[in-house]
Amino acid sequence: MLFRKKIFSVYVLLYVFMSLTSACVEKSVDPTDPAAAFARAREPYDDEMYEIAIQRLGEFKSRYPYSKHAPEAEILIANSQYAMSRYAEAASSYEQFVKLHPRHEQAAFAQFRVGESYWAEAPDDIDREQDYTLKAIAEWEKLVTSYPQSEESKKAKNLLDKGRRRVAEHSEFIAKFYCKQEIYHACAYRYLQLTEQYPQFSDLVKKAYTQAAKAFAQLADGKSKDEQSESNIYYKSLSSQQLRDKAEEFRGKAAAIQL
């Protein structure tokens, strides 16, 4: 890692040296020409020197805030942050771009990248909190609603299914945890919540109904360990017979799902 950092530093210094040398030889950029200034500012971006690109493009934005190239400079800054895995900064930059330029030709791309930035931060493991996955889903849903005809919207729809599946599996993981701890009120509640929020995943819904039925059967027999916790007593008003009826109801729902 240290070796790579040294190599990167050498490349940065070399790039700066070459830029300065070039500046001495070439004709200076006309300060009244935003197009020429932008072309010069984006050179580091084209050469994948993203840290320098952020600086140069930021200076261009400050100098020519009303230029037609200013929005493109904003996108390139966000792209640079994303390329450097600075996802929180990238998400903020892309979000700001959409807010300022909702009708720009790059707006759909920027909205897609807001979601992608959060997605890059989200853990793959379903036993970990999925806050970033939920944020990505929310941003892609905005994209599909605001820019339904865009190519990015089509990509987002595929990723939305993947994201929702991950969150559903995380919900299943939590429900399983409660069942293993014999906390059956919370177990049944979590499984039924999964069936309501993610009905499109038939395999998960079938398992959820099956496990909810088992949890209700345990509750009917008074075997839950969460009876002393008011926050977890979701079905305390139900009699033993009503709990058994619930168990039978959800066994039937599970059996009705054909995979």
Task: Give the ranges of each region predicted by the language model.
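Bacterial N-terminal signal peptides that target proteins for export
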Residues: M1-V12
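Bacterial N-terminal signal peptides
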Residues: Y11-S19
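Acidic, polar-rich low-complexity tracts and alpha-helical solenoid repeat scaffolds
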Residues: L2-F3, T21-L259
